[in-house]
């Protein structure tokens, strides 16, 4: 199940808890391991492969890609995985009737850090009524962070993404790859993507 967080005050508190400190807002480091959290072409390809393979067999999935705002508060609601991201790992996690398939996966750099995570649901009236909990959770987390969230529909097998409070439905693999390519290796030398401009 995905926990519903109704109160705006609670959602705002979680958003504030997710903000990085001064140093981590400029460097995409995993300080626990002393290395840069890289989001490589291989990781992108594995992600895209997993999403469309799951789509073919209508396996529902909810994958949150962390960007500059750390999602530790949501990560702690799930079960630690800390494994290198591969398409097979993601497919295994979301396989129906497995212990980890319910809830969201959080990805940081090239690693799946947590599964079965609880996310806030959007209360936006612009979301189509035919969309389920996964899509509302994807938009919800995108409203309180700069994450990119991928949804695979269990009903249709279609892939959608949520960014900046907006849902992009039924996207193809090239569109997804393009959006994932904005996830930086380091914030010191890359321009922030358009979605973060004000």
Language model regions located:
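Divalent-cation
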Residues: 6-9, 13-187
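Conserved small/polar residues in nucleotide/adenosyl-binding loops
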Residues: 188-194
């Amino acid at each position: 199940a995905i926990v519903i967080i109704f109160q705006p005050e609670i959602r705002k508190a979680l958003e504030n808890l997710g903000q990085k400190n001064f140093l981590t807002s400029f460097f995409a480091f995993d300080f626990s391991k002393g290395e840069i959290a890289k989001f490589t072409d291989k990781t992108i390809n594995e992600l895209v492969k997993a999403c469309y393979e799951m789509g073919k067999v209508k396996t529902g999935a909810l994958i949150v890609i962390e960007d500059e705002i750390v999602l530790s508060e949501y990560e702690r609601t799930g079960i630690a995985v800390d494994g290198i991201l591969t398409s097979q790992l993601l497919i295994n996690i979301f396989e129906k009737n497995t212990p980890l398939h319910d809830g969201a996966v959080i990805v940081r750099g090239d690693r799946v850090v947590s599964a079965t995570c609880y996310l806030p649901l959007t209360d936006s009236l612009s979301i189509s009524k035919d969309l389920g909990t996964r899509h509302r959770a994807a938009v919800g987390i995108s409203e309180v962070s700069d994450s990119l969230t991928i949804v695979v529909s269990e009903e249709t097998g279609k892939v959608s993404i949520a960014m900046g409070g907006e849902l992009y439905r039924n996207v193809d693999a090239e569109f997804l790859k393009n959006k994932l390519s904005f996830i930086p290796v380091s914030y010191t030398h890359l321009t922030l993507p358009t979605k973060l401009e004000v």
